[in-house]
């Protein structure tokens, strides 16, 4: 089995890989210089679709419809595009060893890939209940969602268990989005999470109260303050019941788990400097190892706006960090300088007919504005966060494109504000005037 050698290798085939490939082409790439090595069987695609439109009962999203870079309004990069540009897509290939000093990767089949420059874009893997030793956690019809294969298995179960009972374990992004998707598919949905309210890392209790109330109106049962501690299975090995720590037992035809993710960095342990659970980089996504860059979920990078190191798990950062790394690689080859990465944290979600966006930092005092009652006709409300007399973060539900741009601008500029009363009174119009 002959070695293969490339000038550039992107390890990982997710969102970041696709956006990096596009940036390489934009910057100037010769055929045969770049390879993308991915354990998935398909070309890079927009992962957020899996928890949303992929699960719709009518007109669901399917590949090739959501290959990168459609998620940011760009061109859709089909497998033929990579071929035309002379980019090697090495799919269904798992790398089991990375020798960074030797600039060499080895696949599970023993094949060696050599590189001059490596971009680590390995992303994250889901945290499983079996990681905590939960009894029965390997039963059939317990699902996690990370890759398209996971989504396909869930789609099959949705068809097989039509109108059945679903228990969603977890109250974060995945839990809320999948809870909504399964309710739209006419399942009886219960959500279980240990925290006192949903999305606790971002939402205030007041923001969460709206979504919990709205979900309840849609017929979703929300059970807070407890966790799944075991599962009952039938003779086919399929899950039948979820046992909760508080003693309750829930019937379940399907269980969907969204309890977090961890960055895939184990290949590089002991070879590279790590921090905050990720691979430490500079503002150009260079790591401590020459000619090795890390982007997306795995990178712990300097967040210039707040003068601190952070690791961000979000598609927006995956796209932008990938582009920044490629620009930096090309600039260093040409002896040029580029601007430092200056990222504004951004999160969003869509479920049912709701859609929210958040920009900035959710630290300091939160000021809720608008009507956050689940019964309101408009569902229009938001929140600002004030720290040291400045607005540092902004959240908006059901905003227009102009209003969403306005809250992003506020979070970037961080205007001074004398009192929270002004924000309370003006609401979204405060952001629109900045």
From Swiss-Prot:
Superkingdom as given in the UniProt entry: Eukaryota
Task: Please provide the record's keywords in A-Z order.
Answer: Cytoplasm, FAD, Flavoprotein, NAD, NADP, Oxidoreductase, Redox-active center
The protein's required cofactors: FAD
- In short, the EC number is 1.6.5.4
Enzyme class name: oxidoreductase
Q: Taking the first listed entry, what is the main subcellular location of this protein, grouped into a coarse class?
A: cytoplasm
Annotated binding of FAD, by residue: 13-16, 40, 47, 52, 95, 146-147, 297, 315, 348
What are the subcellular locations of this protein?
A: Cytoplasm
Which cellular component, as a GO term, is one annotated location? cytoplasm
N-terminal signal peptide: none
Name the positions where NAD(+) binds: 171-177, 195, 201, 260, 313-314, 348
The reply to whether Cytoplasm figures as a keyword in the UniProt entry is yes
Q: What function does the entry list?
A: Catalyzes the conversion of monodehydroascorbate to ascorbate, oxidizing NADH in the process.
Which family is annotated?
Answer: Belongs to the FAD-dependent oxidoreductase family.
Report what the protein is called: Monodehydroascorbate reductase, seedling isozyme
Identify the species of origin: Cucumis sativus (Cucumber)
């Amino acid at each position: 089995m002959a070695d293969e050698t490339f000038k550039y290798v992107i390890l990982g085939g997710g969102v970041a890989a696709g956006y990096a490939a596009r940036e390489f082409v934009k910057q100037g790439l010769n055929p045969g210089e770049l390879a993308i090595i991915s354990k998935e069987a398909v070309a890079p695609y927009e992962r957020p679709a899996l928890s949303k439109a992929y699960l719709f009962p009518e007109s669901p999203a399917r590949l090739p419809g959501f290959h990168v870079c459609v998620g940011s309004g760009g061109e859709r990069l089909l497998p033929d595009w990579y071929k035309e540009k002379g980019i090697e897509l090495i799919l269904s290939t798992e790398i089991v060893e990375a020798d960074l000093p030797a600039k060499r990767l080895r696949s599970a089949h023993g094949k060696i890939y050599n590189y001059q420059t490596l971009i680590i874009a390995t992303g994250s893997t889901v945290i499983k209940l079996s990681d905590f030793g939960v009894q029965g956690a390997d039963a059939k019809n317990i699902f996690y969602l990370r890759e398209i294969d996971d989504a396909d298995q869930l789609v099959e179960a949705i068809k097989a268990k039509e109108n059945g009972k679903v228990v969603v374990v977890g109250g974060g992004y995945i839990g809320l989005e999948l809870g909504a998707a399964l309710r739209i598919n006419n399942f009886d949905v219960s959500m279980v999470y240990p925290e006192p309210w949903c999305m606790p890392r971002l939402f205030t209790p007041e923001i969460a109260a709206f979504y919990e109330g709205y979900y309840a109106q849609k017929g979703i049962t929300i059970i807070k303050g407890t966790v799944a501690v075991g599962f009952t299975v039938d003779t086919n090995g399929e899950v039948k019941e979820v046992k909760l720590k508080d003693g309750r037992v829930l019937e379940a035809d399907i269980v969907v788990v969204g309890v977090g993710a961890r960055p895939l960095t184990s290949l590089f342990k002991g070879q590279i400097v790590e921090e905050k659970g990720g691979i430490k980089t500079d503002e150009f996504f260079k790591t401590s190892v020459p000619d090795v860059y890390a982007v997306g979920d795995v990178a712990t990078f300097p967040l210039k706006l707040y003068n601190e190191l952070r690791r961000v798990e979000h598609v927006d950062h995956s796209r932008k960090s990938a582009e920044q790394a490629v620009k930096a690689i090309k600039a260093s080859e040409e002896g040029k300088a580029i601007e430092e990465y200056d990222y504004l944290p951004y999160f969003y979600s869509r479920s049912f007919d709701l859609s929210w966006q958040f920009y900035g930092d959710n630290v300091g005092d939160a000021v809720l504005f608008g009507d956050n009652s689940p019964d309101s006709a408009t569902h229009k409300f938001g929140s600002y966060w004030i720290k040291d007399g400045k607005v540092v973060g902004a959240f908006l539900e059901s905003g227009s494109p102009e209003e969403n741009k306005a809250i992003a601008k506020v979070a970037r500029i961080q205007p001074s504000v004398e009192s929270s009363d002004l924000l309370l009174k003006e609401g979204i119009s405060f952001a629109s005037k900045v």
